[in-house]
């Protein structure tokens, strides 16, 4: 998937008897968009071809969301889409209003620096959802991954123009 398409989240188990699915959201912008809307569905299964789908409805439910798609009307049909990732054309994203706003996808590839501005050999590879808080997944040049909670106590300023993210006391993560 290219940068023209932004990952919105991953589909979970069916919900109810009318073909709804749970959605683990990566970007909450989906709630701001007018439905119906055309999205791409992709699964990490080579037997499941990427396809364009139409999102008919999205609702908040228990801290997450449930979604309904065109042509999916039973739990059995919905079950085929479990684990699928939803992608939105980047051009449909609402514009960022302030310096402190960003999309998760904008963070991927940021260079880690320490509080003094010293460049670390870590790049941000992914942001994983976690019930308590998001987890930043950094990868070192040697391929080793380092997981850091996305909390103010560990993460300082983000500078999308300079492509950097400040890590507070990064040496503690090297020892773990």
Swiss-Prot record:
Cell compartment(s), UniProt: Cytoplasm
Heme recorded as keyword: no
Keywords: Chaperone, Cytoplasm, Ribosome biogenesis, rRNA processing
Single GO MF descriptor: ribosome binding
InterPro entries: PRC_barrel-like_sf, PRC_RimM, RimM, RimM_N, RimM_N_sf, Transl_B-barrel_sf
Origin superkingdom: Bacteria
Pfam families according to UniProt: PRC_RimM, RimM
PANTHER family recorded: RIBOSOME MATURATION FACTOR RIMM
Known role: An accessory protein needed during the final step in the assembly of 30S ribosomal subunit, possibly for assembly of the head region. Essential for efficient processing of 16S rRNA. May be needed both before and after RbfA during the maturation of 16S rRNA. It has affinity for free ribosomal 30S subunits but not for 70S ribosomes.
Record text about domains: The PRC barrel domain binds ribosomal protein uS19.
Protein name: Ribosome maturation factor RimM
Source species: Leptospira interrogans serogroup Icterohaemorrhagiae serovar copenhageni (strain Fiocruz L1-130)
